[in-house]
A protein has these predicted regions:
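Short, hydrophobic-biased amphipathic alpha-helical segments
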Residues: 181-193
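A mature extracytoplasmic/lumenal domain signature
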Residues: 77-79, 87-89, 99, 107-111, ...
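Beta-strand/loop substructures that line and gate deep hydrophobic ligand-binding cavities in soluble
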Residues: 137-184
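Glycine-rich portal/gate segments that line the openings of hydrophobic small-molecule binding cavities
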Residues: 53-54, 65, 94-142, 191-203
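N-terminal secretory signal peptides that target proteins for export/translocation
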Residues: 1-16
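Hydrophobic ligand-binding cavity/cleft-lining segments
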Residues: 37-100, 188
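Bacterial N-terminal signal peptides
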Residues: 19-31
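One face of beta-strands
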Residues: 45, 58-62, 107, 120-122, ...
């Protein structure tokens, strides 16, 4: 006879599923090892992160500034095949097609909670223009809709960065859990990116 899952186990699984939205965003996003320590050590101001939900669709907007030049920021954000190195929950990120200003990037990410593991699959059509990277999922396997953009604009001696994501998960998650985790994990993702921006600029 198969034992039924306890309320704690079911809640844990919902929390695990909720973490996936940010874990896979080139974006976006991310339960990253060491991110909490980086946030403590990083004196940079906390990013402005807004999460909204409407009829099962979640919209995330994040804004932050970094001292690096836009060219450095965009070089990191568009280094698709190296994403697993600085965003470890993204297990694979492979460029399947490449044309001027357009790419197709296939990504897989894994989120774990205790003995439970969930894999997310994306096939992103990416369009690059001056200062902006837009992406949309074309496979619909893990999300019924998933699209967003990064923008990097020169500001003073650094760069103002904006991240936007609109996603509708293909799994059930309580709204209050997902909104809270999206906001927290977006902040962790940004801290990880800040570290990578600084490392690239120092080369």
């Amino acid at each position: 006879m198969r034992a039924s899952s306890s309320p704690q186990t079911r809640d844990g699984r919902r929390r695990c599923a909720a973490r996936l939205l940010v874990a896979v965003a080139v974006c976006v996003s991310v339960a990253l090892p060491g991110a909490r320590a980086a946030a403590i050590a990083d004196p940079a101001p906390s990013p402005e992160v807004l999460v909204r939900e409407e009829r099962g669709t979640y919209r995330v907007t994040a804004r932050f500034e970094v001292p690096e030049a836009p060219a450095v920021v965009l070089a990191v954000l568009s280094d698709y095949e190296q994403i697993p190195r600085f965003m470890p929950d993204v297990r694979t990120s492979v460029v399947r097609e490449r044309a001027p200003g357009r790419l197709v990037v296939e990504q897989e990410a894994v989120s774990k909670f205790m003995m439970f593991s969930k894999q997310v699959h994306l096939v992103l059509e990416v369009n690059e223009s001056e200062g902006t990277i837009r992406f949309v999922d074309r496979c619909g396997k893990s999300f019924t809709s998933y699209q967003g953009a990064w923008s990097a604009v020169s500001k003073g001696n650094g760069t103002a960065v904006t991240y936007e994501l609109t996603a509708r998960p293909a799994f059930d998650v309580p709204e209050f859990i997902l909104k809270r985790l999206l906001k927290r994990d977006s902040g962790q993702m940004i801290n990880r990116l800040r570290s990578e921006f600084a490392a690239r600029a120092a080369r």
